[in-house]
Curated annotation (Swiss-Prot):
Changing residue 729 to R: No cross-link with NEDD8. Its main location: cytoplasm. This is Cullin-3. Gene3D superfamilies: Cullin Repeats, Cullin, Chain C, Domain 2, Winged helix-like DNA-binding domain superfamily/Winged helix DNA-binding domain. The gene is cul3.
């Protein structure tokens, strides 16, 4: 059997670099790269060139080939591209133009030549860049195998990308600083466009696209970010800084803002079309800063066309433009609010000062009544100012909530700073809720009540307002002067919404007393004992709880020598009431009642509606002979009425419109020694006459106001004491600052307590043994049950 031959497998033969001539293959590639740069590629064979590169890479010449290609590209750019670009740069024209735009010089004939030179230089640069891009794409295609095998394994950037980087280093960042000159030339062109010239926008866009596609040396940003953006923003700031300072003194505010708005739109359009959108935001910020932010005060303070002037002239279009423009910048709305507060403070001060001066004049001549005219005028002026500004903000400023809040704060400052504001607001409400105001406010009660609540929000001393409001409400209720119960309760409901249940508790108690009094009075009049003997007069009684009503229970206020006919009725009602309410005490308060009295004069009879005190006075003249008089002191002795009440009622009877009595000597004031006669010759066209007590609803004089505030201060002490005890009872132990803060928070809805007041009340409660300090820490309080 014949033996078969052995099969031998040989190892593959190793290729040696020496087997391939690098120079031969490189010469082919080098010549081809040159032809590509020269745009002479018609005779080139892609397959042949690819094969030459493939062989070199395959035979371990990848690194050498990569470096040689890099050197050829660098040499080509340095020796041919850079000189070709630079010869198109007119250093004289463009250099001088750059200096001029920093100064924002006016247009001159040299600008047209600068425009041509700029276009020529940038065109040369852009064309070179585009040619280089095309060339590198072709070279990269030929050397695709080099990138695939060598560049990737050696962690080298691909040939195409490397060629782009070489362009950056050799052309843009060389010693000639072509990149910087490119940016400066773009700045010149943008400047010329801002001045009204037409420029080649696509050319600039190509330049910026080039810069944006080239990474900076740290590769975190592009040349656009490093070379162009900072310098462009700097030159833009300089341009608008000079422009704004030049024109702001020439144009009115509206004209200036319209010009600024036009500039904003131009820059937005410029960013969109050729500057790249990524610079839009910082660019607009720079323009807004220079045109608006740095001139906010200048624009608002302009004497003839500024913010105050626009408000005074109701320039809604201008105010809307101001708001829209100022809303662009960070501090714009804040500045608007500041100047709005200034406007309110200025006009509020005028309102307060003119009212105070007029009030002082009335006090000097003793004329404080006129149905609280001063209070009504003050309120009307404040409301007119509020309505006007509120309308302006709602109409021209999109009802901006922050500006409306600022407006409210400004009104709080000037209204709350006027010490008579709580009294005036209460008098205004009183004036509008009386029966004789029906025609004046018919169909607009809701608006009046809402306006009143608006003013109520502006006062911090709500307890002072409550003091006056209770007094005025009491007079309306007891004298049956309210326009309607619904209107009164509607006002109280609004106050409750604003200040809470506690604030209106006493006001609601007053209404409840009136309702209960009506029920009790009906029961009294149907009482069998009363029915058996017809009374000499018809008695109507209101039972008022002293906790709700603003009643001065001082002995001199409740004393009065009632006539026998009235005293009998008083005793009878007292017996009836005490039979139903054992343990209670009735105090008769003459100064808050009224009476219907039929009086016989020489010609005819008249039915007079007067105060209870006035009826007591009139009855003194019932048995006097003709021409017999009573001296003031006699009336005082016979009636035992408090001097102030007596004088006011005598003024109503002898010094007002209807002179039921005659006074000697004549005059508006009642003094000791004055003589009073019954006016038998009194005549009037009215059969029924209402005689109101003089100054029943008037502004308080200084002494009365002092007494009112003293009562308020005393009430505040009690409120503070109750609040401190309430907090300590709940917490048992509390640190000083925490107690101060909590008490302040709880009392703020009624009044703003000072830290000193709270400290004094704490000390008073410690003395009264409601609280004590901890033995080892005097700043911690303990509640004593």
């Amino acid at each position: 059997m014949q033996r078969s031959a052995k099969l031998k497998i040989r190892a593959p033969r190793k290729f040696s670099a020496n087997q391939v001539d690098f120079a031969t293959h490189w010469e082919v590639l080098q010549r081809a790269i040159g032809d590509i740069f020269q745009k002479s590629t018609s005779q080139l064979s892609f397959e042949e060139l690819y094969r030459n590169a493939y062989i070199l890479v395959l035979h371990k010449y990848g690194e050498k080939l990569y470096n040689h290609v890099q050197d050829v590209i660098r040499s080509r750019l340095k020796e041919e591209t850079v000189p070709a670009i630079y010869k198109n740069y007119d250093a004289s024209l463009l250099g001088n133009a750059l200096l001029d735009i920093r100064k924002n010089d006016s247009y001159s004939t040299s600008w047209s030549r600068s425009l041509e030179a700029a276009h020529r230089f940038l065109s040369s640069l852009v064309n070179s860049w585009k040619d280089h891009i095309v060339s590198m794409q072709m070279i990269s295609s030929v050397l695709k195998y080099l990138d695939k095998v060598y560049s990737k394994s050696a962690d080298k950037v691909p040939v195409n990308e490397n060629g782009i980087y070489i362009f950056r280093e050799v052309v843009l960042l060389n010693s000639f600083e072509i990149g910087e000159k490119c940016v400066e030339t773009i700045l010149i062109l943008v400047y010329l466009e801002r001045k009204g010239n037409t420029i080649n926008r696509p050319l600039i866009n190509d330049c910026l696209d080039m810069l944006n596609s080239l990474p900076s040396e740290n590769k975190k940003e592009t040349l656009y970010d490093v070379l162009f953006a900072p310098k462009f923003l700097s030159y833009t700031r300089n341009f608008y800084e000079i422009e704004s300072s030049t024109v702001i003194g020439v144009f009115g505010v509206v004209e200036y803002l319209k010009k600024a708005e036009k500039r904003f739109e131009e820059e937005k359009e410029r960013s969109k079309n050729y500057l790249f959108t990524k610079i839009a935001s910082p660019l607009l910020s720079v323009v807004e800063d220079e045109l608006l932010s740095k001139h906010l005060d200048d624009l608002l303070e302009n004497q003839s066309t500024g913010f105050f002037s626009m408000i005074d002239s109701s320039n809604f279009e201008g105010l809307q433009l101001v708001y829209e423009s100022f809303s662009r910048v960070e501090l714009g709305v804040k500045s608007l609010k500041k100047y709005l507060a200034k406007y309110v403070a200025h006009h509020g001060k005028l309102i307060n000062e003119t009212t105070s001066q007029a009030l002082e004049g009335k006090m000097a001549v003793g004329r404080l009544s006129s149905n609280a005219t001063m209070a009504t005028l003050w309120v009307q002026k404040v409301l007119a100012l509020w309505d006007r500004l509120n309308t302006i903000i709602s109409t021209t400023m999109d009802a901006d909530r922050s500006i409306l809040n600022s407006l409210s704060d400004a009104f709080v400052t000037f209204v709350d700073g006027y010490t008579r504001a709580p009294e005036y607001i209460s008098l205004f409400i009183d004036d509008n809720l009386k029966k004789d105001a029906r025609k004046a406010i018919e169909g607009s009660i809701e608006a009046t009540l809402q306006n009143s609540v608006t003013l109520f929000r502006f006062i911090s001393e709500k307890d002072v307002f409550e003091k006056y409001y209770k007094t005025h409400l009491a007079k309306r209720l007891l004298n049956n002067r309210s326009i309607s119960s619904d209107a009164e309760l509607g006002m109280i409901s609004r106050l409750k919404q604003e200040a809470g249940n506690v604030f209106t508790q006493k006001l609601e108690g007053m209404f409840n007393d009136m309702n209960l009094s009506q029920e009790l009075l009906q029961e009294y009049k149907h009482n069998s004992a009363l029915q058996s003997a017809k009374p000499a007069l018809d008695l109507n009684v209101s039972i008022l709880a002293s906790t709700f009503w603003p009643i001065d229970l001082s002995p001199h206020k409740i004393k009065c020598n009632f006539p026998k006919v009235l005293l009998a009725q008083i005793d009878q009602f007292t017996d009836f009431y005490l039979s139903k309410h054992t343990g209670r005490k009735l105090l008769w308060y003459p100064s808050m009642g009224s009476a219907d009295v039929r009086v016989n004069f020489k010609d005819r009879k008249y039915d007079l509606n007067v105060s209870t005190i006035a009826s007591v006075i009139l009855l003194l003249f019932q048995d006097l002979k003709e021409n017999q008089c009573l001296i003031f002191e006699e009336i005082l002795e016979k009636t035992n009425i408090e001097v102030g009440d007596l004088k006011r009622n005598l003024q109503s009877l002898a010094c007002a419109k209807y002179k039921i009595l005659l006074k000697d000597p004549k005059g508006r004031e009642v003094n000791a020694g004055d003589k009073f006669y019954f006016n038998e010759n009194f005549v009037s066209n009215l059969a029924r006459i209402k005689i109101s007590t003089v100054a029943q609803t008037r502004v308080e004089d200084d002494s009365e106001r002092k007494r009112t505030l003293e009562k308020v201060d005393e009430s505040r002490k009690h409120q503070a004491d109750a609040c401190i005890v309430r907090v300590m009872k709940d917490r048992k132990v509390c640190e000083h600052n925490q107690l101060m803060a909590e008490v302040t928070r709880q009392l703020n809805p009624r009044f703003h307590p000072s830290p000193m007041m709270i400290k004094r009340r704490i000390e008073a409660l410690i003395e009264r043994e409601y609280l004590q300090r901890q033995a080892d820490n005097g700043r911690i309080y303990e509640y004593l049950a």
